[in-house]
Amino acid sequence: MSPVISHPRSAAARHQSDELSPITITVDCPAKTNLTLEVGPAHDEWGGRHELDTIYCAIGVYDTVTATAKQPGAGFSLELEGAYLGDLASSRSDMRRNHAVLALFAMAQAAEREPDVALTITKRIPVGAGLGGGSADAAATMLAVNRLWELNWPIERLRTIAATLGADMPFCLTGGLAYGTGFGERITDIAPGSRDELALIEQGFSGEVLVGAYQSQLSTPEVYHTFDIVGAAEGDRNHLQAAAISLHPRSGQAIDAATQAGASHAFVSGSGPSVVAFAADEAAAQRIIEVWRDTAVVDRIIRAKSPEHPNISVRQ
């Protein structure tokens, strides 16, 4: 059974006079990976987060967030669905820490209204996998609420709010390709057909995208702590890769297997443990799939496209 929890607001909460919206907003938001991820020093003013210089890429593994307005005073509710909930399924006691709920609260505070919204999240992006699933859920919630409440705020305003919640969330609002700096929250989009996108294609970041996923998860703080000890390996485009592999050796085995099978690129996604492999064509993709299956170096294989973008739909 999907975990469901509802939090009504207090009796002292301000009366909200807006009429209940009759519509439901559904947002499909893709996962993210990092084509490059350079990690710099930690900054106290950023709460100990590290300086990052990255190229984000949205890949076609989608979580779906559905938002429906509730009666004034009803508070929020959250329902989680899907076969790959990870530790989210055991977090019923504190749904207020869910990224989507935090995003809902942030939007409500910025809009000066109550978070009387029913959220349903269908999870397909692996949890704790370095694929930005929580960030995708938060971004999808912000996009949904922006439409549900008819705020019509521009992306830049949404990104300002998202930056207070997490590093990847500002990127996930738009997906595609983008540069990320600061602690990852400062986004410069890479336009389709631009010189920068063509350069990435020439480097082999095109064609089939394969994700090797795992039942196990990695804690992002633990990966960064390990990075502070072991540093980055020479030649790694992802500075966190060595740390992730030291904590989850199968990721390294999956990278080696994909590379030997002809992957254009194979690397740990973000803080791991998921591995992303780019294949130039269908034949290369099939070789990678076969070797991953034969060697059992991953638990689940996902085929995806890139770069992808969020999709928003409205139902009366």
Curated annotation (Swiss-Prot):
It catalyses: 4-CDP-2-C-methyl-D-erythritol + ATP = 4-CDP-2-C-methyl-D-erythritol 2-phosphate + ADP + H(+). One of its GO terms (biological process) is isopentenyl diphosphate biosynthetic process, methylerythritol 4-phosphate pathway. The keyword ATP-binding applies. It comes from the Bacteria. One of its GO terms (molecular function) is ATP binding. Pathway: Isoprenoid biosynthesis; isopentenyl diphosphate biosynthesis via DXP pathway; isopentenyl diphosphate from 1-deoxy-D-xylulose 5-phosphate: step 3/6. The active site is at 32, 168. Its EC number is 2.7.1.148. InterPro entries: GHMP_kinase_C_dom, GHMP_kinase_C_sf, GHMP_kinase_N_dom, IspE, Ribosomal_Su5_D2-typ_SF, Ribsml_uS5_D2-typ_fold_subgr. ATP binds at residues 126-136. It is an enzyme of class 2 (transferase). Keywords: ATP-binding, Isoprene biosynthesis, Kinase, Nucleotide-binding, Transferase. Catalyzes the phosphorylation of the position 2 hydroxy group of 4-diphosphocytidyl-2C-methyl-D-erythritol. HAMAP family: IspE (MF_00061). Belongs to the GHMP kinase family. IspE subfamily. This is 4-diphosphocytidyl-2-C-methyl-D-erythritol kinase. It comes from Bifidobacterium longum (strain NCC 2705). The lineage of its organism: Bacteria, Bacillati, Actinomycetota, Actinomycetes, Bifidobacteriales. The gene is ispE.
